[in-house]
UniProtKB/Swiss-Prot annotation:
This is Protein fem-1 homolog B. ANK repeats lie at residues 45-74, 87-116, 120-149, 153-182, 186-215, 218-248, 483-527, 531-568. GO terms for cellular component: Cul2-RING ubiquitin ligase complex; cytoplasm; cytosol; mitochondrion; nucleoplasm; nucleus; ubiquitin ligase complex. Pfam families: Ank, Ank_2. It comes from Homo sapiens. The lineage of its organism: Eukaryota, Metazoa, Chordata, Craniata, Vertebrata. Activity of the CRL2(FEM1B) complex toward FNIP1 is inhibited by BEX family proteins (BEX1, BEX2, BEX3, BEX4 and/or BEX5) in absence of reductive stress. Mechanistically, BEX proteins act as pseudosubstrate inhibitors that associate with FEM1B via zinc in absence of reductive stress, thereby preventing association between FEM1B and FNIP1. The gene is FEM1B. The keyword NAD does not apply. Pathway: Protein modification; protein ubiquitination.
Length: 627
């Protein structure tokens, strides 16, 4: 029956109404109920024949299912739309989101709930607003769709239409008394979303309907949002309409100019100077009431520059692009505040431009500043940390000097991020745990790349001590992957992933130097993963024993000298010797096997099945247990 259900689903998906009817012909009522309620899974989607037919716009199939087989319109599934995964979507939601008007009308006329919500509280009306289908929006509203239902982030239909740039839908919703001043969780209104996206006609429409100029949760007005996003026409429109004070007006112009200086998509150094100069003139417009800047203290990442405080100072850097780039970053940090989520992006972009031009020192200064800002704001920094591993690897590959204090600084930030991501994994909901775990493991790999890079860098004794302290700090936290791997397991494992953007030019695993360094910093040599394997169990399975003999030899020596038990058994009761996959690793292991009397006694206890639980000290119980 399951195979037949697959054919039924395929026919519905492809709009083959006659095939579908033939497949269902002469079936019992219970069989039909099973076949038409069967949830098929494909590419991360879960849907019934009705849902997939509606999603793909097959009106004839939908009509057959509704009128002849009385399929329930409230069936729900999981579908993908524009890269988003939608859980709890009905056929009506899918048809509305995909723009299939005929199917929408069929479903509504057969009693589909126009206000049914998905898991994230999205309605069919919201789906139609996202797609900009005014005809579907009107039809749903005329059939009692509630325009005020917001999703789980309190984001309304008006907001999504404003952000996506659907002017006609926005106008219609406003005419239907949608609230232009409703706020999303982040504190943003429809005007914020329209301003950020640069939809000037929608901004005009919202102003006409008396949309209020308010700050969002990050202290940003629609005017500031437009300026930060380089939407000059929206900024000028809001300045001409909005009743804003002199300081707000000046800061909007400054922010606009500053944003043009370091924006990948909208870079325009001429506009940078133009708007910064306009703002400066406004500061000095009234000689009796000059509005002085409250400049930031000099910041090392910005070359310890001080922001221009008068027209003459600004004129002096007009032809100096580098100075204008730094001026832009300083202005943004002053106006937005160091804790603003958007401050770091242009800093990272400018650093990347320096890296592309082989100006690595400038790049690292900026990226370290951005990293500190993001960690201070409790942002996820796994991409930032990986970026450092990539640029350090590139530098080593090009024989450029990587400074040990820079590595130590990034390692310190990495330890902090891993500690925070360990807590996130513990406290996060089941729905988000997979992503959180991915980020956490990515941080562990990045830490190992940085340790590997440190072994290829000239370090003073003092610098090496500082680096070792960070390694010790992380080892002390005992971070584990899903498989229960410690840092030591990862260091000796050929399956440890290595990022392929510059990093794999410098880093590889198993890695003898990283293994030795981890052991020197206190890594537990006999720690086991979820399968009871120690690092020694892992390395003896290395499949390049000839071409990479030195690595294999060095790691086995390091592990044994650090106290690895060569007779330790895993959950399959296998010792490292049993797990050895090559003659070379077997020989290396045998030459290193120095069985202590303590180990021989423990093996004898296990081999003869002697009861030792609660008969010997607890520390010895564990020792006997892994033999």
């Amino acid at each position: 029956m399951e195979g037949l259900a697959g054919y039924v689903y395929k026919a519905a998906s492809e709009g083959k109404v006659l095939t579908l009817a033939a497949l269902l012909l002469n079936r019992s009522e219970s069989d039909i109920r099973y076949l038409l309620g069967y949830v098929s899974q494909q590419g991360g989607q879960r849907s019934t024949p009705l849902i997939i037919a509606a999603r793909n716009g097959h009106a004839k199939v939908v009509r057959l299912l509704l009128e002849h087989y009385r399929v329930q319109t409230q069936q729900t599934g999981t579908v993908r739309f524009d890269g988003y995964v939608i859980d709890g979507a009905t056929a009506l939601w899918c048809a509305a989101g995909a723009g299939h008007f005929e199917v929408v009308k069929l479903l509504v006329s057969h009693g589909a709930n126009v206000n049914h919500t998905t898991v994230t509280n999205s309605t069919p009306l919201r789906a139609a607003c996202f797609d900009g289908r005014l005809d579907i929006v009107k039809y749903l509203v005329e059939n009692n769709a509630n325009i005020s239902i917001a999703n789980k982030y309190d984001n309304t239909c008006l907001m999504i239409a404003a952000y996506k740039g659907h002017t006609d839908v926005v106008r219609y919703l406003l005419e239907q008394r949608a609230d232009p001043n409703a706020k999303a969780h982040c504190g943003a209104t429809a005007l914020h979303f329209a301003a950020e996206a640069g939809h000037i006609d929608i901004v005009k429409e919202l102003i006409k309907w008396r949309a209020a100029i308010v700050v969002n949760g990050h202290g940003m007005t629609p005017l500031k949002v437009a300026a930060e996003s380089c939407k000059a026409d929206v900024v000028e429109l809001l300045l001409s309409h909005a009743d804003c004070d002199r300081r707000s007006r000046i800061e909007a112009l400054e922010l606009l100019g500053a944003s043009f200086a370091n924006d990948r998509e909208n870079y325009d150094i001429i506009k940078t100077y133009h708007y910064l100069y306009l703002a400066m003139l406004e500061r000095f417009q009234d000689g009796d009431n000059i509005l002085e800047k409250e400049v930031l203290p000099p910041i090392h990442a910005y070359g310890n520059r001080t922001e221009c405080r008068n027209p003459q100072e600004l004129e002096s850097i007009r032809q100096d692009r580098d100075a204008l780039h730094m001026e832009g970053l300083i202005v943004r940090e002053r106006i937005l505040g160091a804790d603003n989520i958007d401050v770091s992006h242009p800093i990272i972009y400018r650093g990347a431009v320096y890296a592309d031009n082989m100006e690595f020192e400038q790049c690292i200064k900026l990226w370290l500043h951005a990293l500190h800002l993001r960690q201070k704001g409790n942002r996820n920094t796994h991409k930032d940390l990986l970026r450092f591993a990539q640029v350090f690897s590139q530098m080593i590959h090009l024989n450029e000097t990587v400074k040990a204090p820079d590595i130590e600084c990034v390692l310190r930030c990495s330890v902090l991020e891993i500690e925070q991501s360990m807590n996130r994994v513990k406290n996060i909901s089941d729905a988000d745990v997979h992503n959180a775990m991915d980020n956490y493991e990515c941080n562990l790999y990045t830490f190992l790349y940085l340790v590997c890079i440190s072994t290829k860098t000239q370090c003073s004794e003092e610098d090496q001590c500082k680096i070792n302290k960070q390694i010790y700090n992380l080892i002390h936290l005992d971070p584990r992957t899903r498989e229960g791997f410690t840092l030591l397991h990862l260091a000796v494992n050929s399956n440890t992933p290595v990022d392929d953007f510059h990093t794999n030019d410098v880093c590889s695993f198993p890695n003898a130097l990283v293994t030795k360094l981890l052991l020197d910093c206190g890594a537990e040599v006999n720690a086991v993963d979820n399968e009871g394997n120690s690092a020694l169990h892992i390395i003896v399975q290395y499949n390049r024993p000839i071409s990479d003999f030195l690595t294999l030899h060095s790691i086995i020596i390091s592990l044994v000298e650090a106290g690895a038990h060569t007779d330790m058994t895993n959950k399959q009761n296998k010792t490292p010797l049993d797990k050895s996959t090559t003659g070379v690793s077997e020989i290396l292991l045998k030459t290193q096997m120095k069985m202590s009397l303590k180990c021989l006694a423990a093996r004898a206890v296990r081999a003869n099945d002697i009861n030792y639980q609660d008969q010997i000290p607890r520390t010895l119980e564990e020792f006997v247990g892994f033999h």
